[in-house]
Amino acid sequence: IYSSFSRREVLVAQLEVRAGNPPSGVHLLVQSQRMERFHLLDDFWVTWQQWFTELEETHTSLGVLSFFRSPQAHRSWVTASGAVLDGASLRLAAVDMPFDPEAGICVRAGFFALRAIADYYGIPYDPEPRPGDPISITKDEFLQACDDLVDAGIPVRDDRDAAWVDFTGWRVNYDVPLLSLAGFIMTPYAPWSSDRSFRFRRAGLRRRPTRP
């Protein structure tokens, strides 16, 4: 258990350098640009693909790990997940650069993991959301994020309406599981996740038996 917890927390702690405190997807992209490492984000997405895959395996076979808090109170594996997924979704939807397949795979790995953990605790969500379904992020928040990217020197698509539609199409896959887990585990504050999380009573959720 400790080795799984420790591996999880190494990347959560490292993320603060890129994504700030509290972590955010916007800050992740902005800081990468400022550090002249935007072109190296492919490697970052691959690293987090692997992290999400291991998260799914460990946190559904050893469910208690979900409640093991980070050594630093302001950090959380849930809000770290949200920041990385939002960063990847913004890269895919808003940034005016060629499609980044590794960012897309990272989003898929992430929502697979969050959904699996939500399933473990009986947390409901729509397993087949459609791109037009509502999400918890407002269009104004998204447009402000685009402005922040532009201010940092990151090229953003001229058609912000189309970018918004694309962003919702990515975010809808993990929006409810992310916010639900943030509320269920009572994570520290972070934008676009625990700041608007759903509150679930632990006693009202059915937990699946631990795998043998």
What are these regions (language model features)?
Residues 1-2:
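Transmembrane alpha-helices and immediately adjacent membrane-cytoplasm interface residues
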